[in-house]
Amino acid sequence: MNTVSSSDQARVQELRQLLQKASYAYYGLDAPLMEDAVYDQLYHELVDLEAQYPQLITPDSPTQRVGERPATQFVSVQHRIPLYSLENAFDRGDMDTWDERWHKLVPNLSQEPGYVTELKIDGSALALTYENGLLVRGTTRGDGTKGEEITQNVRTIRSIPLRLNIEHPPEWLEVRGEAFLGLQVFDQINRDRIQAGEAEFANPRNAAAGTLRQLDSKVVAERKLDFFAYTIHISGPTDDLALPQTQWQALETLKQLGFRVNPNRRQCESLAEVQTYYDDWSLKRLDLPYLTDGVVIKLDNLGVQDELGFTQKFPRWAIAWKYPPEEAATRIEQITVNVGRTGALTPVAEFKPVQLAGTTVSRATLHNRDRISELDIHIGDTVVVRKAGEIIPEVLRVLPELRPAGAQPYQMPTACPSCGQPAVQLETEAVTRCVNASCPAILRGSLIHWVSRGALDIDGLGEKIVGQLTDSQMVQSVADLYELNEDKLMDLDRMGTKLARKIVSAIATSKQQPWHRVLYGLGIRHVGSVNAQLLTENYPTVDALMAVDGDKIATIHGIGPEIAQSVYEWFQTPTNQTLIQRLQSAGLQFEAIVSESTQPQTLSGKTFVITGTLPTLKRDQAKQMIQDAGGKVTGSVSKNTSYVVVGADAGSKLTKAQSLGINQLSEADLLALLQ
């Protein structure tokens, strides 16, 4: 290793500081200090010096954004603070409803909290963690509670500082924001992919998400992702960093720390002003160098935000007001019919591909016979399609003046396209159904549902393998899955020993899934995962559930008459009773391990919040234990919170609990309460 001269050491430090200052001016202030060519020259000088003296390389050096060894996989990590998505509004009526709702939850405000409006960037959400001023982790949104750690890739984004622009940083700080691709960069990426013989990305959002999950950070660096910050969480104030009291102050703090914040934001005193901002940008946004699909509205006062807290999915103090979806005209080329696991025949319009909200769309559901009649659909019709919520394509209307001569109205098939048996439509339903219990399409759909993550979670059994199992008649019921072995699976096309062993192991493991998952996996009409949980809480064994009628089931809070009757009729069907017997013989769980009728309700009436990482219990385990003992677990601290269970790296919930004088429990304290 070369000996470093004092002059070279000083030069490295000077270059580092100058390049960091230039990056902050360029990305944080939109005020470049130097030409790109000058920056590049200084950057390469630093690269050369660090190559000569590797001992001088530091994690926050600008050179460390690129060139790390490709990752082999991404690790799932728990978010310190949940990274929630936002509730959507699609018109002023939705906005008024939201505004009335949060006002009712905080009726005694001394003054209005105000609003901050920001453009909703069409990209991928990131959570950035800084410790003592240094970037230590970058994480995707994931499911909101856990995301994938992609720190190597995040470090390549030039608008994300590796070191905070502050002399006395807090112990930890978390920033949330949106990674995105500018339109020019996106177009260049697609041109490069075409030249390389690769498929184009459908839209900038998909390209950004795919880029962030690249295993090679050099590829990420080449694609020039950008980043706007919009939320900050701070462990505590420091000598030169005060805790923001408003959302507007939080954005200014982010700028001060070196982050790029979207300049097109505004403080508003009323919904009328929010409406003006929304209307102003409805057309101006089309001239922006990046895509935006709406406006994010947040209450400005952070104290009111804390008081309102969160639902299970969204913050109550923020909402995304989406712009109307794009519409396009196209011609229906054919209508195909899909058969679902419940036997429902769903017509799907196949049409000439069109661009909608930045994506290519070539098909859309027509729902059912009534919807087809309402639209008066003919094969060959020119129709207007749009994306409902800018996600699901739908046929909005027909342009009959463009209908070709001789076109015939489309009629739903009278026979199932999968099995050929007669299709029926009950008077009480708009849906046409196949009622053949042996229909291959119904069986295939039932199996795919059974093995899905929310049900029995049988890893390795994807749609292709399920299709082979049903086509070969190796599996004609979900119970047949539990008679499979490696030798049988090896008869399938492209099945290797390793995969066969994995599938057999996953099938065996699925026998330990709890009763509520088994009930959900059975695919009873109208019984989703939440309803399955409610049913098993009230009927902890399958025998208990089979012994009651629909009227009794309907007395469960949250279970209506239609759901109750569907459950009752399913369990009265002889073939379903035989299925239950076979699954019981295979060893699946049809009894709750701990039922509410026998578990002591020692925590009844108590409300808990869990924060940080517990020593031995996973958060879901602790939550379940509290609920089994009659307690309630919420996601935010309020004056109604009885206890806060505190683990390592506890965040702002602990700070708020301390300010409210709420009792704090360790994991050991919680376990003692449960005894």
From Swiss-Prot:
Query: Which SMART domains does its entry note?
Result: BRCT (SM00292), HhH1 (SM00278), LIGANc (SM00532)
- Tell me the cofactors it needs: Mg(2+); Mn(2+)
Ranges for domain BRCT come to 598-675
Question: What does it catalyze?
Answer: NAD(+) + (deoxyribonucleotide)n-3'-hydroxyl + 5'-phospho-(deoxyribonucleotide)m = (deoxyribonucleotide)n+m + AMP + beta-nicotinamide D-nucleotide
- Please tell me where Zn(2+) binds in this chain: C416, C419, C434, C439
Q: Does the keyword Mitochondrion apply?
A: no
User: What residues make up the catalytic site?
Assistant: K120
The top EC class, named as a word, is ligase
Q: Which InterPro entries match?
A: BRCT_dom, BRCT_dom_sf, DisA/LigA_HHH, DNA_ligase, DNA_ligase_AS, DNA_ligase_CS, DNAligase_adenylation, DNAligase_N
* Family stated for the protein in its record: Belongs to the NAD-dependent DNA ligase family. LigA subfamily.
What does the function comment of this entry state? DNA ligase that catalyzes the formation of phosphodiester linkages between 5'-phosphoryl and 3'-hydroxyl groups in double-stranded DNA using NAD as a coenzyme and as the energy source for the reaction. It is essential for DNA replication and repair of damaged DNA.
- What is the protein name stated in its UniProt record? DNA ligase
- Organism (species): Acaryochloris marina (strain MBIC 11017)
